[in-house]
Amino acid sequence: MKKIMSTNPKTPELIQKLKEESFKNSAPIWKDVAKKLAKPARKKVEVNVSKISRYASEGDVLLIPGKVLGAGSLKVNVTVAAFSFSETAKSAIEAVGGKCLTIEELIAENPKGSKVTIMA
């Protein structure tokens, strides 16, 4: 097994938890997210609020295996789970009635990962 190197000590722990949950709940979505989080920092996902607004519908549950940035505006009420959020992104999502979750909170809420869309 490949050793995961990261300057953020939270990353390898989260990747391990995602793999365990994928196996335990027969949910391949968590394994896919773990692979995306294991990428080098220069290839990590960064999604702006404007992209969420462009592609999401009202009430969607989105999973971003990276960081959510605050550029743009949001017009739909969505639940967004991500590795991290910028302060402006968090306030923009919550301003329209959406929820910001960590990936761990999403796993606790929805262990099977049903009706979750990965946005990368």
Swiss-Prot record:
GO terms of biological process kind: translation
Keywords annotated in UniProt: Ribonucleoprotein, Ribosomal protein
Entries under Pfam families matching the protein: Ribosomal_L18 (PF17135)
Transcription listed as a keyword: no
Molecular functions per Gene Ontology: RNA binding; structural constituent of ribosome
Gene3D superfamilies linked: 3.100.10.10
Signal sequence residues: none
GO CC list: cytosolic large ribosomal subunit
Superkingdom of origin: Archaea
PANTHER family recorded: 60S RIBOSOMAL PROTEIN L18, LARGE RIBOSOMAL SUBUNIT PROTEIN EL18
Record family assignment: Belongs to the eukaryotic ribosomal protein eL18 family.
The name this protein goes by in its record: Large ribosomal subunit protein eL18
Gene that specifies this protein: rpl18e
